[in-house]
A protein has these predicted regions:
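Conserved core architecture of multi-subunit DNA-directed RNA polymerases
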Residues: 1-252
C-alpha cells in the first residue's frame, strides 16, 4: 500500500503567523548542516552538507533516510544551521529598538508604573500599566494588530517610556541611557558623555529577560518572544522545495 493512500485529509481551521522558537527549528530538523559543500567528486552528497539526503531526495530510485520514501512520496525535511554567534534579524530592527527603549536596561521590566493611582487617565485607582494595557487591548479588538491605530498606541508607549521622566527605572532604581540605532543593525546605549555598544549577545540577553506580561506594551503577545529575532539557529529548507538551475544539462537544486 502506498504512503499516499494512508493519509487522512484534514481541514485547516486557522493559520497563525508569528515568530518561530529556535528550539522548534532544532526539533523539526532532520540534520544539522555543518558544511557549505554539496557533492563529492563521486557524485554523492556530503553528510551534513547542503544536499544531505536526510533533507529529502530528488533522484529516482533513492530513498530518503529520514522517512524511507522515494522522491515522489517524500515531502522533504528541514535541516538547520547552528550559528556560532547570534545575529540580529534586519527585518525586526524596529521591534528591537522599541523593546530596548521601552524596558529597563537592568531588570528588563517595562518603564511604566505598576502602582495604583499612577494612571494618566481618569481612574484614580488604575496603574499606568493597566491604563496602557487596556488601551492596547481595546485597539486590538476594534482595529487589529495590523492597523494604523495599533502602531500609534505602541509608538505612544515607546515615547512615554523613553521620555526624560524615565531616566531612572521605577522598579529597580537603575539609571537609564538613551538607545541609539546606527543603521542597519548596531545598537548603542548612551549615558551622558559615555556610550556603550550593544552587541547581538547583549541585545538577546536583554530581550530574553522581558516578562511575558509586559510584551503587550511593545506590540507582542505571550506566544512569541522578542529574543527570537536575534538569531542563533537558521532553518534550512527541504531540498525538494528549493529553486533549481540547469548546469551542464543537469538539474541542480540550490
Amino acid at each position: 500500500m502506498s504512503r499516499k493512500s494512508t493519509m487522512i485529509p484534514k481541514r485547516i481551521a486557522q493559520i497563525r503567523f508569528g515568530l518561530m522558537d529556535p528550539s522548534e527549528i532544532r526539533k523539526m530538523s532532520a540534520v544539522e548542516v555543518k558544511t557549505a559543500d554539496t557533492y563529492k567528486d563521486d557524485g554523492h552528497a556530503y553528510k551534513q552538507g547542503l544536499m544531505d539526503p536526510h533533507m529529502g531526495v530528488i533522484e529516482p530510485g533513492l530513498l530518503c533516510p529520514t522517512d524511507n520514501c522515494q522522491y515522489q512520496d517524500s515531502p522533504g525535511h528541514f535541516g538547520h544551521i547552528q550559528l556560532e554567534l547570534p545575529v540580529i534579524h534586519i527585518g525586526f530592527v524596529n521591534l528591537i529598538k522599541t523593546a530596548l527603549k521601552a524596558t529597563c536596561n537592568d531588570c528588563s521590566n517595562i518603564l511604566l508604573h505598576s502602582e495604583p493611582g499612577t494612571s494618566p487617565g481618569s481612574n484614580p485607582e488604575q496603574s499606568e500599566q493597566d491604563y496602557y494595557r487596556n488601551r492596547i487591548r481595546d485597539v486590538i479588538t476594534k482595529h487589529g494588530v495590523g492597523s494604523t491605530e495599533f502602531s500609534k498606541i505602541i509608538k505612544e508607549v515607546e515615547k512615554v517610556t523613553s521620555g526624560t521622566k524615565r531616566k531612572v527605572c521605577m522598579h529597580c532604581g537603575s539609571s537609564q541611557g538613551k538607545i541609539i540605532l546606527d543603521k542597519p543593525t548596531t545598537f548603542k546605549e548612551k549615558h551622558d558623555n559615555t556610550e556603550r555598544k550593544l552587541n547581538p549577545r547583549d541585545v538577546r540577553e536583554w530581550l530574553s529577560s522581558i516578562p511575558p506580561e509586559h510584551l503587550i506594551f511593545i506590540g507582542m503577545d505571550k506566544q512569541n518572544r522578542p529574543e527570537w529575532v536575534v538569531l542563533k539557529v537558521l532553518p534550512v529548507p527541504p531540498i525538494t522545495v528549493r529553486p533549481s538551475i540547469t548546469l551542464d544539462l543537469s538539474l541542480i537544486h540550490i
